[in-house]
């Protein structure tokens, strides 16, 4: 089972990715985490680290190289779920080439879709407990009275709005690319966690590599 999972910030992608990976026994390969780990262990050249600090996007070949290495590890033999990559058509083609060189291919691309205004509401009312790291929502998951709450910078309305717009711009061509290949599964991301998980699973019954329950 080789999957790509895409969705705007605040769509609940992280929650669903963990549930799916636990169900199928495959790793979640998050490119952001890989880059941070590579930076921390000195695997990236100093000039690239400096560019990352300025917000410059990491070259595709660097990310593909990290994915190539990670996807060969023992826990990824049965497949993996890619989170955060690809974001553009050139990246998608690079991923296709990598998998093709191994005689492999993607099984599906899951696109979690949530209306923009709901994304903003989810993020703007989200709070983090500074002591425990636990995430709460002032409307949907109120914190206990003793929580030491902070409103993270990346949950501010203008920041979230910009991130959502960036996601929409980047996927304008990416989603049609996968749709033309019959790989795209559009998932309604509005509802409870279990409800959304059921929708995802319902889009995948015909995949030949889908593990038995």
Region spans (language model):
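Glycine-rich phosphate-binding loop of ATP-dependent small-molecule kinases
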Residues: 1-213
């Amino acid at each position: 089972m080789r999957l790509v999972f895409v969705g705007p910030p605040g769509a609940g992608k992280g929650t669903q990715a963990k549930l799916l990976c636990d169900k199928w026994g495959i790793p979640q390969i998050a490119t952001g985490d890989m880059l941070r780990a590579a930076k921390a262990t000195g695997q990236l050249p100093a000039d690239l680290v400096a560019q990352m600090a300025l917000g410059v996007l990491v070259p595709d070949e660097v990310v593909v190289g990290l994915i190539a290495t990670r996807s060969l590890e023992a826990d990824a033999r049965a497949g993996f779920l890619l989170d955060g990559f690809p974001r553009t058509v050139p990246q998608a083609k690079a991923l296709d080439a990598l998998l093709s060189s191994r005689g492999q291919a993607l099984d599906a691309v899951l696109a979690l879709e949530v209306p923009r205004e709901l994304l903003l509401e989810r993020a703007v009312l989200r709070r983090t407990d500074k002591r425990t790291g636990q995430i709460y929502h002032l409307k949907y998951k109120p914190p206990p009275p003793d929580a030491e709450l902070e409103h993270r910078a990346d949950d501010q309305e203008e920041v979230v709005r910009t991130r959502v717009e960036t996601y929409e711009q980047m996927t304008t061509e990416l989603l049609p690319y996968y749709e033309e290949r019959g790989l795209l599964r559009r998932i309604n991301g509005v509802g409870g966690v279990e409800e959304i998980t059921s929708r995802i699973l319902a889009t995948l019954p015909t995949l030949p590599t889908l593990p038995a329950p």
